[in-house]
Amino acid sequence: MATAGKVIKCKAAVAWEAGKPLSIEEVEVAPPQAMEVRVKILYTALCHTDVYFWEAKGQTPVFPRILGHEAGGIVESVGEGVTELVPGDHVLPVFTGECKDCAHCKSEESNLCDLLRINVDRGVMIGDGQSRFTINGKPIFHFVGTSTFSEYTVIHVGCLAKINPEAPLDKVCVLSCGLSTGLGATLNVAKPKKGSTVAIFGLGAVGLAAMEGARMAGASRIIGVDLNPAKYEQAKKFGCTDFVNPKDHTKPVQEVLVEMTNGGVDRAVECTGHIDAMIATFECVHDGWGVAVLVGVPHKEAVFKTHPMNFLNEKTLKGTFFGNYKPRTDLPEVVEMYMRKELDLEKFITHSVPFSQINTAFDLMLKGEGLRCITRTDQ
């Protein structure tokens, strides 16, 4: 492309300080360096993680910053050493990477890349410790190596999944974080059998993606657990057959579920990050074969307490990160699941706004309205 090797000026939504509305600014985006790729972002979605680090409550504030990590785009140019991507390729940026060289990447059992595992505090490129974004010469920090709230961004090649160019980017962009996290937690980690009973704790976008995985796996009974009764109607679209609100019961919700299911559910997936829900997720599974999977990120001082007999009675507890998907290796196949109409993404996309109104997406999420709001960056 004619822009290769040159600085590109484009629009970006900049977070200047914690909790303040993003500002649409003209930024300069430098060319990609070794093992980097400059991507033209076409569609980007808002994830709760963006909101969490925008609010910057309880973490190191890194500002000014360009947030965003769920997106779909097209390769504009590549840096030295990049051989697997060329200009024009369609890609999904991912907040965590796959270098393909470390012990984790070489293991079939892990997706926790040593080099490119998520780093929320870095704010610069891993190669030279510099930002590729500037405004009037002043550096603007990156976010989790992606910074997709910009018309152009620079990303390490290991954090880009090359996908089918026929796949609509305004739909599959939501697969680059939350939906894959929930879907994979069920399909790759819990692995429910056809006809089994599955409980999903937390019915936000990630929990509903986990529920979609249970539906795809052929679970015959899918129990949604949430403190908001309004979530049940929406969850029915994802295969939910029963709904339990812990506030409606005097006994612990795990006891309610055990009674409902004649001894416990076959699989349970937790998508809340609340420690009580995590414990309940484990304690509600059936002895002998029950598997519980933890997805949510708890408070750093939270402590998981359960009786050791739960383990001795052959209940299994697992954790997962990004649904155990290796970004570059596995995400292209998740896109194909959508293309084959096995996976329905449209029902996750509840809102769409122009890039100039990106703050509306933040307002919707803060109010708990909708699941995913898509923004088209050229609007």
From Swiss-Prot:
The record's keywords, sorted A to Z, are: Cytoplasm, Metal-binding, NAD, Oxidoreductase, Zinc
Protein name stated in the entry: Alcohol dehydrogenase 3
* Keyword Zinc belongs to the record: yes
Q: What is its EC number?
A: 1.1.1.1
Q: Where is the organism placed in the taxonomic lineage, from the top? A: Eukaryota, Viridiplantae, Streptophyta, Embryophyta, Tracheophyta
Record's keyword annotation contains Cytoplasm: yes
Family, per entry: Belongs to the zinc-containing alcohol dehydrogenase family.
SUPFAM superfamilies attached to this UniProt entry? GroES-like, NAD(P)-binding Rossmann-fold domains
Which Pfam families has this protein been placed in? ADH_N, ADH_zinc_N
The alphabetized list of GO BP terms reads:
formaldehyde catabolic process
| Cofactor(s) this protein requires | Zn(2+)
Can you state which reaction this protein catalyses? a primary alcohol + NAD(+) = an aldehyde + NADH + H(+); a secondary alcohol + NAD(+) = a ketone + NADH + H(+)
For binding Zn(2+) 2, which residues are annotated in this chain's numbering? C99, C102, C105, C113
